Amino acid sequence: MAAAGAFRLRRAASALLLRSPRLPARELSAPARLYHKKVVDHYENPRNVGSLDKTSKNVGTGLVGAPACGDVMKLQIQVDEKGKIVDARFKTFGCGSAIASSSLATEWVKGKTVEEALTIKNTDIAKELCLPPVKLHCSMLAEDAIKAALADYKLKQEPKKGEAEKK
């Protein structure tokens, strides 16, 4: 209940800072100016929030964190039998830039093959979201989460010791 209240308070504060008719754009506070409209959009309307069944063989899970700022990101991918990512979900505890980076990453991996998803770089995420230099670590978390999820998926595809000996 307290988390929901805090979320509503943050959303209301950001709405006031970003859309108040009494505050022209040039007079926005410093924190509001740090976030590009793309970050605000992904923060206020995050895409693909949630979880997939981590025990499923076709789901890869990546869990990464940044000790410097306390951000934690879980990103999951679901891959079909042809090696194409058909779904992606995330849960992130962190700032607006971390949430936006996670949201964008899930959008970008969907429809890609496992190998294509490996080419997504933090610099591309940072550029798309117009992240300031002090928030680049958030895009790095997203790249690391993608790589960790892909590695987990690939590990699940390897035959188990007992299965390999039976064949």
From Swiss-Prot:
One of the GO BP terms on file: intracellular iron ion homeostasis
Effect of H137A: Stabilizes the D-state
Residues carrying the site annotation Mediates ISCU dimerization and de novo [2Fe-2S] cluster assembly: Y35
Outcome of mutating C138S: Loss of iron-based stimulation of the cysteine desulfurase activity in the presence of FXN
Posttranslational modification: Phosphorylation at Ser-14 is required for ISCU protein stabilization in the cytosol, whereas dephosphorylation of Ser-14, due to the inhibition of mTORC1 (mammalian target of rapamycin complex 1) complex, leads to degradation of the precursor form and ultimately to a decrease in the mitochondrial mature form.
Residues spanning the signal sequence: none
Gene3D superfamilies, A to Z: 3.90.1010.10
GO terms of molecular function: 2 iron, 2 sulfur cluster binding; ferrous iron binding; iron ion binding; iron-sulfur cluster chaperone activity; molecular adaptor activity; protein homodimerization activity; zinc ion binding
Keyword entries, A-Z: Cytoplasm, Iron, Metal-binding, Mitochondrion, Nucleus, Phosphoprotein, Transit peptide
Entry binding sites for Zn(2+): D71, C95, C138
Active site per database record: C69 (cysteine persulfide intermediate), C138 (cysteine persulfide intermediate)
Mutation effect (D71V): Stabilizes the S-state
Tissue expression profile of the protein: Detected in heart, liver, skeletal muscle, brain, pancreas, kidney, lung and placenta.
GO cellular component terms attached to this protein's record: cytoplasm; cytosol; iron-sulfur cluster assembly complex; mitochondrial [2Fe-2S] assembly complex; mitochondrial matrix; mitochondrion; nucleus
Organelle targeting sequence: 1-34
PTM sites of type Phosphoserine: S14
Effect of mutating M140V: Does not affect the SDA complex formation. Abolishes desulfurase activity of SDA complex when zinc ion is bound. Activated by FXN when component of SDAU complex
Effect on the protein of changing Y35A: Does not affect mitochondrial localization. Loss of iron-sulfur cluster biogenesis. Does not affect reductive cleavage of the ISCU2-bound-persulfide by FDX2
Disease (UniProt): Myopathy with exercise intolerance Swedish type: Autosomal recessive metabolic disease characterized by lifelong severe exercise intolerance, in which minor exertion causes fatigue of active muscles, shortness of breath, and cardiac palpitations in association with lactic acidosis. The biochemical phenotype is characterized by a deficiency in mitochondrial iron-sulfur proteins and impaired muscle oxidative metabolism.
PANTHER family, A to Z: IRON-SULFUR CLUSTER ASSEMBLY ENZYME NIFU HOMOLOG
Family in the record: Belongs to the NifU family.
Entry protein name: Iron-sulfur cluster assembly enzyme ISCU
Organism: Homo sapiens
